[in-house]
From Swiss-Prot:
Gene symbol of the encoding locus: mxa
Domain Dynamin-type G, first and last residues per copy: 34-307
The UniProt record lists the keyword NADP: no
Location relative to the cell: Cytoplasm
Keyword Glycosyltransferase listed: no
Organism listed in the record: Danio rerio (Zebrafish)
Protein name, entry field: Interferon-induced GTP-binding protein MxA
Binding site for GTP: 44-51, 145-149, 214-217
Primary location group: cytoplasm
G1 motif, as annotated region: 44-51
Induction notes from the record: By interferons.
GO molecular function: GTP binding; GTPase activity; microtubule binding
Amino acid sequence: MEKLSYTFSQQYEEKIRPCIDTIDNLRSLGVEKDLALPAIAVIGDQSSGKSSVLEALSGVPLPRGSGIVTRCPLELKMIRTKDQDRWHGRISYKTCEEDFDDPAEVEKKIRQAQDEMAGAGVGISEELISLQITSADVPDLTLIDLPGIARVAVKGQPENIGDQIKRLIRKFVTRQETINLVVVPCNVDIATTEALQMAQAEDPDGERTLGILTKPDLVDKGTEGTVVDIVHNEVIHLTKGYMIVRCRGQKEIMDQVTLNEATETESAFFKDHPHFSKLYEEGFATIPKLAEKLTIELVHHIQKSLPRLEEQIETKLAETQKELEAYGNGPPSEPAARLSFFIDKVTAFNQDMLNLTTGEDVKCTTDLLLFPELRQEFAKWSHILDRSGDSFNKKIEKEVDNYEVKYRGRELPGFINYKTFEGLVRDQIKLLEEPALKTLKTVSDVVRKKFIQLAQCSFIGFPNLLKIAKTKIEGIKLNKESLAESMLKTQFKMELIVYSQDGTYSQSLKHAKDKLEEMEKERPQPKIKLPLLSSFDLGTDNHATLREMRLHLKSYYTIASKRLADQIPMVIRYMLLQEAALELQRNMLQLLQDKDGVDNLLKEDCDIGQKRENLLSRQTRLIEGTQPLGHLLEVTFIDYCNILMQ
């Protein structure tokens, strides 16, 4: 393999390598579990020459054979060192990490890791294997090799193996942070390759896709010009363009041609080729040029992604912190500390309960609001009263006639029958009792639901404590609902006593009369003058009496409905919020008296401890990941380009 100049390498050590190392370190910390990291994913159909390209880049033999050879995503991390005699390998997967110093062991180590991850055979796994190679003969580069796309399942493979592989590939190529390195043989129709089609589906403009043409020595005579056109980006356009390489073929492998010898052969092939020599001269050919191109692209992509990556880490940290706050700290083991912890839990719940029922912010969660729903229910109650008033007005004329016939006794015509007035008022008020009780039931259910939600977010991970809180909420709900129902029924019994202050009633009556006069003035006058309320024209003087009765009924209903519009919600709020919250607080405080029962109430859900541990691990990963990003953000991409052009 051609070696990069020492100056180039020195600049890597100072600037480029830290950039790539930062992303590699984030990946090793497990940050990729939380968000996507900049990467180069290598994809290709089976037998596309993908493994040969990676072998040539890394300088070590990788697993080969027919069918699916790459059965797990393989992170190939190459670190260039100044020490010409040093070669070191490290393979990591699951909880295993192994160092070795013989490059010949790479293939065996990868196969062992794949067997452990995906099982012996030909299955695949989505778990990542990481292979780190430190050598003077490799570029500073990190690639992720993905399984080759299979068209037909072979013996021992599930029928949907092709779909499994494509699903795995899509996990990587859909990410905006991924550069798609698509490997395509020169001797096939590039437009029909599934690897390029998948990349185009997720990256239609080709901004994240780089094409690699392999096996130029197998091109049919007469088609070389098409290959040149593809590399020149004149057939299927990719923003990042194309490169062309020639790696060891199967015969050369069997003849034990070394990778260094293969690189020399590749260089000679392109220099002397009648059609491809200009690609060599233009810098589009050979593995060393590909390594340089990939390094430039990766560093560019990393630098471009850094601001967004920093923002994502900050967002994820905030989300993690919020989740940790929701789960809270686990209970301490020391008895006195456990009691203090329990007291704090109950006190915080009681304070949040008070805040919830008075419309203040709840500390344990930001989206638990009670009063907006109560306001809606009470608005519905007010609407019921308005509709009842409208229907009352419509039936007044008919009902007054009926009451006059049925109840008017010795009074002379023209006198208002107070008994008729009271009867009509009472009948209308009775119709409102059932809707009021329904409003009570609805609000009671809303309050119960909110109280339970508060308990759930206050006692996350403590099932026994949550259970007893729910039991108390249910009991108090039934009790206070029953008391509120009794108060409402009493209220409606009192409403059957027709009463209002003289001043209040007189004002309401005057308002009703003024409104009626305005309506009559606006009504078109008939050519033949008729009484103002023709429906009351009974051929007697009773129409004046009935007109007065109608005004009195409307006036009183207005007063009664306003009274009920406020009184019913006040009774409900008093019993279901204020009294229920106070009783629940007292009940919860009584738990503190049973010190022997504290341990049982603080038994934590087995899953919660694990979730808290996972969140703490994520928080640690993300915090550690932010430290090197700050420095890299200070270095602009122009700095990197200047280095690479030296």
